Amino acid sequence: MQGKMSFIIRGGLMEYLVNSREMKLCDFNTINKLGMPSMVLMERAALAVVEELEGLDLGKVLVVCGKGNNGGDGFAIGRLLHLKGIQVEILFIDEEEGCSQETKEQIKIARNYGVKILDQVEFNKYTIIDALLGIGLSRKVRGKYAEIIDEINKTSAYILAVDIPSGISADDGKVLGTAVRAHKTVTFAFKKIGLVLYPGAEYAGELVVKDIGINHLGFEKSPKTYSHTPEDLKLVPKRRPYSNKGSYGKVLVIAGSLDMAGAAYLSAKASYRMGVGLVYIYTVEENREILQTLIPEAVLTGYNRVDLDEGTLIGRIKDARVIVIGPGMGISKATRKILELVLREADVPLIIDA
């Protein structure tokens, strides 16, 4: 399987999200184990971006390139736009000697085709393609790169980021000093975590994932990070018209303590959102009024913190199909007694919060 990838997780489809290390491993294995030349991947990345630009009134295009492979993508994009007859210029402020080998090759090809490569421009004249910094960025952007990013953000131009907006961490979405605010980001093969988490998601604008032939070879068997896809919603079964709430599971939520009603409320609410039909809440009597106001559909049983009625609790335990215990309960004697009782009496799955 190549490109956009979904894993089967307990019967559902989950879209895998990669960090920078995982993405680099996918690149490495595609090139070194499967034999796909890196220049071919770079060319396919450039074609994917140019394809995404079709139909836009581009006017004059500025491709801002760095010295890494993200910049190499940018030089290839500039060349392809040039061959389409679009007026394009490339801003490159680094020394060519410091570039990756692939980027050096792309610079050479762009020059051979007569693409203009400049070291200074007026940013407000262009549609801007951001190919300055890629997913490998791990420290704050400073100096001339920071100045360029700030100039890009000052313009009213349409901005498209290549793979990730320059200055955004691919691992967590943080702004590393400063970052490009893009209208659209075309990322390759898989979504990066930093494009889904904020503020990275905001800086990315519209997110488009393009398959360029990178294989998932090297992924771990169980994804570390993944998100739901629209296909997941199709897996949620429709409720039968002749069913009742008891047909869709009974969860016992044992949670909360004095002045800690929120944990019980959130646990019960989460149960309903996951499709549970009937939720029982077992909490201290003092939480009754607020919980019956916040979540009146739940069946609430309050207990006396000093004189616990074990029979009532055992009845609730025997009626439940899943038991949640622990959120917001504290470390009182009553909590210990309740936990011991649940561990002894329950023969259903337990979700225990430490």
Named regions from a protein language model:
Residues 122-126, 179, 317-318, 343:
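A short, aliphatic-rich alpha-helical micro-motif
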Residues 106-109, 176-180, 203-204, 296-301:
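Short, hinge-like loop/turn segments at secondary-structure boundaries
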Residues 51-132, 140-162:
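Nucleotide and nucleotide-moiety/phosphate-recognizing core
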